[in-house]
């Protein structure tokens, strides 16, 4: 049984949800990206990208490794880039979910999410407001 799109959108706009975005919908790339929701407010859904490799020019501690063995929906072990966040208007996020621009992928388990939140709270590349999204 498939969930109604509005319910799916609300579920996948909460902390720990992972969605796949279409090419160039959030990040300018030649391929779609996995986005991890780290915070939802009344007006924003704050996300980080999930990558197959670490960025060499960013601190390793700001890119926690997430294991496929603990998150079955991942294709391989991955890295969350806590140093770059995307604050998306909540209505735009939900609209993108309903139109299929964002597609639900899965939910991070609690241990993986704890690693991400810790990395974001201490990330030296973020200001205090941005770090607070991870609390």
Regions flagged by a language model, labelled:
Residues 13, 60-63, 94-95:
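A generic structural signal for ordered alpha-helices
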Residues 2-8:
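Short alpha-helix capping/helix-loop boundary micro-motifs
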Residues 9, 14-16:
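Loop/turn positions that initiate beta-strands
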Residues 69-135:
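C-terminal terminal-subdomain/extension
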Residues 27-72:
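Compact nucleic-acid interaction/catalytic patches
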């Amino acid at each position: 049984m498939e969930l109604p799109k509005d319910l799916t959108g609300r579920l996948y706009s909460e902390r720990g949800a992972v969605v796949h975005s279409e090419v160039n919908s959030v990040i300018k790339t030649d391929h779609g990206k996995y986005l991890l929701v780290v915070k939802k407010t009344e007006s924003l859904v704050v996300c980080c990208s999930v990558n197959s490799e670490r960025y060499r020019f960013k601190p390793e501690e700001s890119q926690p490794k997430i294991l496929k063995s603990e998150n079955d929906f991942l294709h391989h072990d991955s890295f969350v880039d806590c140093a770059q966040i995307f604050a998306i208007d909540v209505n735009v996020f939900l609209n993108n979910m309903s139109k299929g621009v964002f597609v639900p992928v899965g939910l991070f388990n609690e241990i993986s999410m704890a690693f991400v939140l810790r990395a974001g709270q201490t990330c030296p590349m973020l200001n205090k407001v941005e770090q607070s999204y991870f609390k």
